[in-house]
Amino acid sequence: MSAYTVSRLALDAGVSVHIVRDYLLRGLLRPVAYTTGGYGLFDDTALQRLRFVRAAFEAGIGLDALARLCRALDAADGDGASAQLAVLRQLVERRREALASLEMQLAAMPTEPAQHAESLP
């Protein structure tokens, strides 16, 4: 098992230490052990979760929804986790549809300046 400090976890995930600490406060991550000095230690599963949470956040999934999923996973609540995964899948599908619509609108946009723009001062 690899043991990660907050700073090493952040570095390996490509995020700031502040993001890791924020995710800890929100319950998205939790240490698997503590040093004698009281610092949290994390394992490979925490790194994988951090990468997942960050990717989901970057894709537009809110941290509150992700926190509900993480809490259900941490509580070994299979039904709760399944329900939260279903909610996230619905959000992803809505995002996918919105992006497809946006792509069609972008494709239909003219690339030339409007003709009436020539008459503007």
UniProtKB/Swiss-Prot annotation:
Q: Name one GO molecular function term.
A: DNA binding
Q: Where is the HTH merR-type domain?
A: 3-72
Q: Which GO terms describe its biological process?
A: negative regulation of DNA-templated transcription; response to mercury ion
The cross-references to InterPro entries, in alphabetical order and at most eight, read: DNA-bd_dom_put_sf, MerD, MerR-type_HTH_dom, MerR_fam
Source domain of life: Bacteria
Where do transmembrane segments lie in this chain? none
DNA-binding region(s), chain positions: 6-25
Does this UniProt record's set of keywords contain Zinc? no
Q: Which Pfam families match?
A: MerR_1
Q: Which SUPFAM superfamilies match?
A: Putative DNA-binding domain
Q: What UniProt keywords are attached to this protein's entry?
A: DNA-binding, Mercuric resistance, Plasmid, Transcription, Transcription regulation
Name of the featured protein: HTH-type transcriptional regulator MerD
Instruction: State the species of origin.
Output: Salmonella typhi
